[in-house]
A protein has these predicted regions:
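Polar-ligand-bearing catalytic/cofactor-coordination segments
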Residues: 1-10, 28, 43-184, 195-286
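Short, hydrophobic transmembrane alpha-helix segments
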Residues: 19-29
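Hydrophobic core segments of alpha-helical transmembrane domains in multi-pass membrane proteins
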Residues: 30-40
Length: 286
């Protein structure tokens, strides 16, 4: 319920932001265009954000005969979690990672990379998949997928505004009267938009990871399995960085973008792996 409310607030805020931008650059005509754009984006985010996320990650559906072991694990965990069995996808990369997406538990998908299947044993794979099913059970997946879509859209709109202003604005009188200020505002938006998208990701992601870890550990009854998997994923993902869209970084079980530097932990979409492992090791009794 709370996640559905947060999703509604997020979509409403995006609509309001687009209306303000449209009115500033092209008056009433800009507001009408922004309203149509917001309606398309809101509907698209709700119904197609999971498909967009799977497409952006390069995930492919995997049939039961291709990996019966994976299907058995997912089906067993879904039964324990009390949720429908999600669709299963495979991401062809050696970097170990995984994510879940969808509108609700009845329309959910989980995706795992080849790296996860290569480096993890069955208990560790169970831990990873239980974590992802934890996101499904906790209903994190809709807001997570919507944020991924909107983060990309925010950056795209900022670029459109910038290039539109650079090559003569949007044709409105306001744009013509404010050419200097409009160009400065468009440039500022180009800089601020990615930061705003990142802050949105940070606002909804860190606590969710702790909660999904705890839920996954309860599903399996084996927090050590997930703790070992996280340790392996952390080490191997540094050796084999994953090529992932920044707008999707918050969706993965492990931060796919290696930033490094003094601000890396501050602006990471995930809590430090060490802290996640320590919390799990302390959760051995259920």
């Amino acid at each position: 319920m709370w996640n559905n409310l947060k999703t509604t607030i997020l979509l409403a805020a995006m609509t309001g932001g687009l209306l303000v931008i449209g009115e500033y650059w092209a008056g009433q005509r800009g507001m009408m265009f922004a309203l149509v754009l917001a309606a398309v984006m809101n509907l698209g985010s709700y119904f197609f954000s999971d498909k967009i996320a799977l497409k952006m990650s390069g995930a492919k559906p995997i049939a039961r005969q291709e990996n019966p072991r994976l299907y058995q694990i997912v089906e067993r965990l879904a039964a324990k979690a009390g949720i429908p069995v999600p669709k299963i996808y495979y991401i062809p990369t050696d970097s170990p990672n995984a994510f879940a997406t969808g509108r609700n538990p009845s329309h959910a998908s989980v995706a795992v990379t080849g790296g996860i299947l290569d480096i993890c044993d069955d208990e560790e794979i169970e831990g990873v998949l239980a974590h992802e099913l934890g996101h499904v059970k906790n209903r994190d997946i809709l807001i997570s997928a919507v944020v991924a879509t909107l983060a990309g859209a925010i950056t795209l709109i900022a670029r459109m505004v910038y290039w539109g202003e650079l090559f003569g604005g949007f044709g409105g009188s306001r744009s013509n009267n404010r050419r200097g200020g409009g160009m400065f505002s468009a440039l500022a938006m180009m800089i601020v938009a990615p930061l705003a998208a990142m802050l949105i990701q940070l606002a909804i992601s860190r606590s969710r990871e702790y909660e999904a870890d705890a839920t996954g550990a309860r599903i399996t009854g084996n927090p050590q399995g997930l703790a070992r998997a996280l340790d392996k994923i952390d080490k191997w993902s540094k050796r084999i960085p994953m090529q992932a869209s920044p707008s999707m970084a918050h969706m993965y079980i492990c931060q796919p973008l290696t930033t490094g530097g003094v601000f890396s932990s501050l602006f990471s979409t995930h809590p430090p792996m060490r802290k996640r492992i320590e919390r799990l090791i302390g959760r051995e009794q259920f």
